[in-house]
A protein has these predicted regions:
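Histidine/lysine/aspartate-rich catalytic loop segments that bind and position anionic ligands
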Residues: 18-74
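Catalytic cores of alpha/beta
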Residues: 27-37, 80, 84-98
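Surface-exposed amphipathic alpha-helices with a cationic face
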Residues: 7-17, 35, 65-73, 124-131
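Charged helix-capping and loop-helix junction motifs
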Residues: 1-5, 56-65, 117-121
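Glycine-rich phosphate-binding active-site loops on the catalytic face of alpha/beta enzymes
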Residues: 42-53, 97-116
Length: 133
């Protein structure tokens, strides 16, 4: 695969004091590869979770939970994102190993109607409530 190329890129970035972050599926093999490549940070792809409903979404949520826990045990900084919005962010925000959520599209879409300050404030409230409860 691409491990040699990714490792080389991670090394070049590290030489410039830049932390590489790899966007990966919530999968143990990809987490192992991220460690092998020398990436200190990963962003777990939450798109499949965001696209699903019902039981299938719960199964995918568990994949994200398990991946976040495993990646944290490996020493990685765990972020998550893609497809997260006001109605599905809470379950992901509750995962304690996740340091940062990358949410953009839904906030900007909401901002068209409610203004950016209101859109950001509401998303922040949802994340804060999920993390404190």
């Amino acid at each position: 695969g691409q491990l040699d190329k990714v490792t080389s890129a991670c090394n070049r970035l590290a030489e410039m004091d830049v932390r590489a972050s790899l966007f990966i599926d919530p999968d143990r093999l990809q987490l192992d590869a991220a460690v092998a490549a020398g990436a200190p940070v990963v962003e777990l792809h939450t798109g499949a979770y965001a696209d699903m409903e019902g039981e299938a979404q719960l199964v995918e949520l568990q994949r994200v939970v398990d991946a976040a826990h495993y990646g944290h045990e490996l020493g990685l900084i765990i972020n998550a994102g893609h497809g997260l919005h006001y109605h599905n962010v809470a379950a992901i925000a509750q995962i304690p190993e996740i340091v940062e959520l990358n949410i953009g599209h839904s906030i900007i879409s909401r901002a068209v109607f409610d203004g950016l300050a209101m859109a950001v404030s509401e998303m922040k409230r949802l994340i804060t409530e999920a993390r404190s409860g």
